[in-house]
């Protein structure tokens, strides 16, 4: 079910009502109701769309609570300072909410919302929700691109999420679903934990010809090796979407997730990967998933997720001034 944006999420400290250099995001955000006809987007525009759903996590035997994340992350974003270039417009496009365990219907609805934003010329940032968010996100990107475009999916994650879906989709099946139904998609996962995936899942990754880099490869560096692989991957595709699972981050920095990672990525390393990926001209859309405010400690996971979303905004190549 679609819910229009809630202005109540966008409040916070006010340092000035006149000096725009002192503004925060809550003073610049615009509300966009997708149930109404869309205005023509600014030349450089982006929109947040929430996916309040953790039904996929429940089906995957995980710990629920991620459906609370869109509201919490938006409230944390509201307080961050505005550093975007002049002329950029940022919208809150509301939320798609999963009702009565209707995961598949909700993913379809999210896809329609994302497609509408992209077709209107906006960059989209989807705030999940469990990682089942990524499937709905993909549906929207594919609709916007058309059936023939080669799409690269970059996933920053501790897990492959290539589980079988004989008993229905979950938060651990979506990339297998996508690869089974779309031969114009390739998949590259950064941050894989050897102790977070069975030998069967590593075998499945080989079967599906997935590219991946282990967490310890990324941590040992140099990061330029990852950058080189990202560039090669993007070069093979017409467009790229980024999906980011917060359980890729070390549990010390991101305890508020369903499946915390004791040997996860450092936030600064993840930030560098986000910056590199979204600054590529082929990257058109981003999602961030698996924040669970009910399991968080002092709001640190929510705050980190909001910072990652802002980093995506700041470095989206399509939001930079035209030269």
From Swiss-Prot:
Which keywords does the record carry? Histidine metabolism, Hydrolase, Manganese, Metal-binding
Describe cofactor binding as the record notes it.
Binds 2 manganese ions per subunit.
What functional role does this protein have? Catalyzes the conversion of N-formimidoyl-L-glutamate to L-glutamate and formamide.
Please state the Enzyme Commission number of this protein: 3.5.3.8
**Co-factor requirement:** Mn(2+)
The record's annotation in Pfam families points to: Arginase
Indicate which residues the UniProt annotation says bind Mn(2+) 1. Answer: 131, 157, 161, 245
The processes (GO biological process) annotated in the record are: L-histidine catabolic process to glutamate and formamide; L-histidine catabolic process to glutamate and formate; putrescine biosynthetic process from arginine, via agmatine
**Which pathway does it operate in?**
Amino-acid degradation; L-histidine degradation into L-glutamate; L-glutamate from N-formimidoyl-L-glutamate (hydrolase route): step 1/1
Residues that coordinate or bind Mn(2+) 2:
157, 159, 245, 247
Can you tell me which family this protein belongs to?
Belongs to the arginase family.
Give the gene that encodes this protein: hutG
Q: What is this protein called?
A: Formimidoylglutamase
Q: Specify the species.
A: Geobacillus kaustophilus (strain HTA426)
What would be an example GO MF term here? manganese ion binding
| Catalysed reaction equations from the record | N-formimidoyl-L-glutamate + H2O = formamide + L-glutamate
Tell me where the signal peptide lies. none
């Amino acid at each position: 079910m679609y819910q229009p944006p809630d202005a109540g999420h966008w409040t916070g400290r006010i340092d000035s009502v006149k000096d725009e250099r002192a503004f925060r995001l809550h003073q610049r955000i615009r509300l966009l109701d997708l149930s109404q006809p869309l205005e023509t987007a600014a030349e450089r525009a982006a929109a947040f769309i929430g996916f309040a759903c953790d039904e996929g996590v429940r089906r995957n035997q995980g710990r629920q609570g991620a459906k609370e994340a869109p509201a919490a992350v938006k409230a944390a974003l509201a307080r961050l300072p505005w550093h975007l270039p002049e002329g950029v417009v940022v919208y809150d496009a509301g939320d798609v909410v999963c009702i009565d365990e209707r995961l598949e219907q909700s993913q379809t609805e999210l896809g329609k919302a994302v497609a509408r934003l992209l077709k209107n010329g906006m960059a989209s940032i989807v705030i999940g929700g469990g990682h089942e968010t990524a499937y709905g996100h993909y549906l929207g990107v594919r609709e916007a691109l058309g059936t023939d475009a080669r799409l690269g999916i970059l996933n920053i994650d501790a897990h492959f999420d290539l589980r079988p879906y004989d008993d229905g989709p979950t938060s651990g099946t979506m990339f297998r679903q996508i690869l089974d139904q779309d031969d114009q998609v390739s998949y590259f996962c950064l941050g894989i934990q050897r102790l977070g995936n069975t030998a069967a899942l590593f075998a499945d990754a080989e079967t599906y010809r997935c590219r991946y880099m282990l967490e310890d490869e990324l941590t040992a560096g140099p990061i330029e090796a990852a950058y080189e692989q990202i560039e090669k991957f993007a070069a093979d595709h017409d467009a790229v979407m980024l999906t980011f699972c917060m359980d890729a981050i070390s549990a010390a920095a991101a305890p508020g997730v369903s499946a915390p990672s004791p040997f996860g990525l450092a936030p600064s390393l993840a930030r560098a990967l986000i910056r590199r990926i979204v600054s590529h001209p082929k990257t058109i859309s981003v999602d961030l998933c698996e924040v669970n405010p009910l399991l968080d400690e002092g709001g640190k996971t929510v705050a980190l997720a909001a910072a990652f979303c802002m980093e995506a905004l700041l470095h989206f190549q399509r939001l930079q001034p035209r030269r």
